[in-house]
């Protein structure tokens, strides 16, 4: 189905940050799509706050954080573009411009202007004592993705440091971080 789009793109393009990338806070990534398709994916994904786009390879990264909250992970990076969700007209998302999807869902357009909310991610792990220090470039919280998570200093690790996001939106993980008892 073809939709007539009346979205204003000027503001979004004027605020685009060329040569920058926010690292290690991905929901998912997609290859072979245009920059505007990348922005639309963000607008349809409830948890998305920003995107990175690598122009030479038409590669999109959908982020769950903004640069303001993680300045240490925001880098100058040639070929990349960084943009925030709030900079874009929601009308780009067509029938998904005002969905009522849950935080870990994304809006998927269907025939005749209908929409469907589908699970997009497992959320940000909140287990006691965990650290995102070992998250690797390419790790993500999206469905069928994995993250490398370890324990904070002062905690003992039991189990694997690899969390896998299952299709039902629940992490598969056996990492337990137990507070160590240090005698002084």
PLM features per residue range, with description:
Residues 57, 61, 70, 79-81, ...:
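A sequence-level detector of short, solvent-exposed, charge-rich linear segments
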Residues 14-66:
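N-terminal "mature ectodomain cap" immediately after the signal peptide
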Residues 8-36, 77-184:
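Conserved N-terminal submotifs of small, disulfide-stabilized extracellular modules
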Residues 67-73, 182-184:
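Short, charged/polar, Gly/Pro-enriched secondary-structure boundary elements
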Residues 1-7:
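Cleavable N-terminal signal peptides of Sec/SRP-targeted secreted and luminal proteins
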């Amino acid at each position: 189905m073809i939709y007539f789009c009346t979205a204003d793109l000027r503001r979004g393009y004027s605020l685009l940050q060329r040569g920058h990338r926010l690292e290690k806070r991905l929901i998912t990534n997609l290859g072979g799509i245009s920059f505007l398709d990348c922005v639309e994916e963000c607008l349809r994904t409830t948890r998305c706050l920003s995107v990175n786009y690598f122009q030479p390879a038409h590669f999109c990264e959908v982020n769950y954080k903004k640069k303001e909250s993680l300045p240490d992970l925001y880098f100058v990076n040639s070929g990349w573009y960084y943009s925030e969700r709030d900079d874009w007209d929601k009308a780009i998302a067509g029938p998904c411009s005002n969905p009522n999807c849950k935080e870990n869902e994304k809006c998927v357009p269907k025939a005749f202007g209908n929409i469907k909310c589908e699970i997009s991610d497992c959320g940000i792990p909140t287990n006691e004592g965990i650290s995102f220090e070992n998250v690797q470039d390419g790790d993500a919280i999206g469905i069928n993705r994995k993250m490398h998570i370890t324990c904070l200093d002062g905690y003992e690790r039991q189990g694997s440091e690899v969390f896998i996001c299952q299709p039902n939106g629940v992490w598969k993980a056996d990492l337990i971080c137990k507070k160590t008892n240090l005698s002084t």
